[in-house]
């Protein structure tokens, strides 16, 4: 079972448009999602990344903008643009939130 580790490859090209294709894979290409609940949790995490709130519940600027995503059994595709933090920090935030779920 995955959820112990999500791996992403380092960016190989700099996007002049600021839009990046990110691929997250399961460790050793293992399953990322075991059931519908796992998929829903991942989508909830994406929503939290694009609609963050402070400790008082007030909205904060988004960490990124997500244009598209595709949840596969053993990997995930995300098309995103940087927001208030660097892409690598956002990808790490997404990965850690799902791993800790």
Region locations from a protein language model:
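Short catalytic/metal-binding and nucleic-acid-binding patches
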Residues: 1-101
């Amino acid at each position: 079972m995955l959820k112990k580790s999500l791996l992403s490859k380092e960016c190989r090209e700099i996007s002049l448009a600021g839009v990046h294709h990110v691929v997250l894979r399961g460790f050793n290409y293992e399953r990322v999602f075991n059931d519908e609940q796992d998929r829903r949790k991942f989508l909830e995490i994406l929503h939290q990344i694009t609609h963050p709130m402070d400790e008082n519940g007030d909205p904060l600027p988004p960490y990124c903008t997500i244009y598209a995503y595709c949840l596969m059994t053993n990997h995930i595709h995300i098309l995103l643009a940087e927001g208030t933090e660097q892409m690598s920090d956002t990808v790490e935030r997404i990965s850690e939130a799902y791993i800790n779920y």
